[in-house]
């Protein structure tokens, strides 16, 4: 097992390194800008497979991973399971706009900190990220 080497020391300054995974470019851009306003360093990936590549390239060097559930190639749940297996200290948040996907995520309470239901406001996102990073 490898331990995620995040940047928790930055949290005093409200800055974290976040991996954002979503297959919709407009959503990625909007969420990235919103998180950067809070001072977070955000790396994006366009699907679960790309997200896992980014995570491995950084040797787990993220404080938090925020991922959509429904994506091509590898969905967010498969990504969360693989990420937690390799980087057990990684904090994971899921996002979904589908009730059935939210139900699938309920069984992952041991590895997922929270599930955001789309649509959500930027204020909701920022508050959820702040709580997750403080946990």
What are these regions (language model features)?
Residues 29-37:
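Charged docking surfaces used in two-component/phosphorelay signaling
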Residues 46-50, 75-79:
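Acidic catalytic/metal-coordinating carboxylates
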Residues 71:
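Receiver (REC) domain active-site loop signature in two-component systems and cognate sites
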Residues 78, 85, 98-116, 123, ...:
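Alpha4 helix (beta4-alpha4-beta5 surface) of REC/receiver domains from two-component response regulators
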Residues 39-46, 54:
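Short hydrophobic/Thr-rich beta-strand motif most characteristic of the beta2 strand and flanking loop
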Residues 21-22, 45, 65:
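Conserved sequence signature across two-component system core domains
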Residues 60-66:
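Active-site beta3 strand of CheY-like receiver
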């Amino acid at each position: 097992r490898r331990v995620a080497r995040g940047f928790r020391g930055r949290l005093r300054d409200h800055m974290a390194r976040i991996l954002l995974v979503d297959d919709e470019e407009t959503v990625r851009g909007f969420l990235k800008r919103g998180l950067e306003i809070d001072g977070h360093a955000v790396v994006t990936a366009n699907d679960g497979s790309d997200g896992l590549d980014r995570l491995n390239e950084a040797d787990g060097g993220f404080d938090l991973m925020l991922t959509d559930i429904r994506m091509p190639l590898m969905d967010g749940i498969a990504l969360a399971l693989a990420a937690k297996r390799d980087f057990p200290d990684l904090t994971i948040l899921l996002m979904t706009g589908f009730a059935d996907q939210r139900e699938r995520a309920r069984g992952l309470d041991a590895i997922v900190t929270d599930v955001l239901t789309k649509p959500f406001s930027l204020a909701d996102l920022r508050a959820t990220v702040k709580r997750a990073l403080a946990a």
